[in-house]
Amino acid sequence: MVSVQMNDNESIDKMLKRFKKKYERAGVLKEFRQNAYFVKPSVDGRLKRSRSKRRAQRANEERNS
């Protein structure tokens, strides 16, 4: 559970910005999206390998450029 206390003389905008940052760092939304539907372990592994391969290719292209 992410919670934020409002500091003295702090605007609501700044408080919301701090909340959003904590919310993102906690990974709440990412976890929710991952658990929205079931993915078989074999499919999950395949997706992770393909993502890893793409990430490696991009990193390799950046190094060569």
From Swiss-Prot:
Molecular function as annotated in GO: structural constituent of ribosome
Annotated segments matching region Disordered: 45-65
Record-linked Pfam families: Ribosomal_S21 (PF01165)
Keywords recorded for this protein, A-Z: Ribonucleoprotein, Ribosomal protein
Biased composition (Basic residues): 48-57
GO annotation, cellular component aspect: ribonucleoprotein complex; ribosome
Biological processes per GO annotation: translation
InterPro entries, A to Z: Ribosomal_bS21, Ribosomal_bS21_sf
Domain of life: Bacteria
Protein family (similarity comment): Belongs to the bacterial ribosomal protein bS21 family.
Entry-linked NCBIfam families: S21p
Protein name: Small ribosomal subunit protein bS21
Upper lineage: Bacteria, Pseudomonadati, Chlorobiota, Chlorobiia, Chlorobiales
Chain's gene name: rpsU
